[in-house]
Amino acid sequence: MDGKLRADEVAVTKSILKSTFNMWMDIIDVDVVIIGAGPSGLTAAKYLAQNGVKTVVLERHLSFGGGTWGGGMGFPNIVVEKPADEILREAGIKLDEVDGEDELFTADSVEVPAKLGVAAIDAGAKILTGIVVEDLILKEDKIAGVVIQSYAIEKAGLHIDPLTISAKYVIDSTGHDASAVHTLARKNKDLGIEVPGEKSMWAEKGENSLTRNTREIFPGLYVCGMAANAYHAGYRMGAIFGGMYLSGKKCAEMILEKLENK
């Protein structure tokens, strides 16, 4: 071996096009589409995929993890509490005990999304970045999939028609915006859906309401993470993430139960 690298331009292009075509053909009809690759979305993806559920995660940005990367006000740590710490430990994430706080741990705000994303991918979930969900497929009073567009095309303001992905269930894990639910409410006012938005910060109340607010809010459409609190007017929490991970896990468990009973 002389160490010379092959770099034929056309071969590179052909390889990308063939691989991309095969990938899209495989994911245009799935069990679950998760909108938003933040902490709750990645957690839901991991638990769904490791149970054999065909899962696609769509993220508008070119990286997954949502707001985790920035830690608290840019300081590179987040806080997680019991029992949510077990979710991170399963993904091989190192946790440090907090002096004087028996149930609180800190974690590296870069390590957490990196390893949680890899855990979801290794479980079998497909994560696509640079894709925005601009609408939902609504058939016979049930959500049946998502309408997707390139985020670059959307940002450029170009009028180009979108494509679609069919799904048995859709999860809105878009965070504070609850963008999928907002879109459903705005475009289908006859459904009577309202999104009051989240309240101001009350960390303990917000954390404890997250799993309670995680549910199917319309046939085929679930909310988890901060989208759940935004839909139910729950409190925000700041840089403590345990409720987010527990919300994602609960959402996955609810859908798994639905799929098993079908």
From Swiss-Prot:
Entry keyword set: Iron, Metal-binding, NAD, Thiamine biosynthesis, Transferase
Cofactor: Fe(2+)
Gene3D superfamilies (alphabetical): FAD/NAD(P)-binding domain
UniProt GO BP: thiamine biosynthetic process; thiamine diphosphate biosynthetic process; thiazole biosynthetic process
UniProt: glycine binding residues: R236
Family note: Belongs to the THI4 family.
Protein name: Thiamine thiazole synthase
Protein encoded by which gene: thi4
